[in-house]
Amino acid sequence: MKGVAPFFGIKAGPRRELLKEHMAANGVPTVDELPTVVRDAFTCQERELHHTAVDLLTKQARKLGPEQLPWIEDALTAKSWWDTVDALATHVIGTILKRHPEAIPTWNERWITSADLWLNRTAILFQNRWKADTDLDLLFTNIDRHAARQEFFLRKAIGWALRE
């Protein structure tokens, strides 16, 4: 993670506790407020703000639908790195698409055919927590489309998806 972006130096536990205290005092952002909160967090350089935005989205994931995916995709591609991309793919996007399987073909095709490595990684990983509900045909098709690529982060995603 060194060199990817600056950090405040706040570890995950204390950062999450600060978020919890803030939400207790100020309320949880509504679904309508989330796009602004997330975009604002991702315009900042410090990674803790990106992680906080991901934590907020993870907590609200069951309230989100496919209509939120365009601005969630913006977060995926803003200052992309494996930590935020993986959390968004598996905990947020995976939750949304499992609840709204009709949206999978459109979003999967968009991401798996993208020139953006992080969107490709998202298409490979979004089913990771689905266990027995994983669409193996879709997963293997996604993997086959990128199996020859040598990028470290794609190869790691393929390995992780296969282990799950």
Label every PLM stretch briefly.
Residues 1-164:
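Surface-facing alpha-helical segments and adjacent helix-coil boundary elements at the starts of domains
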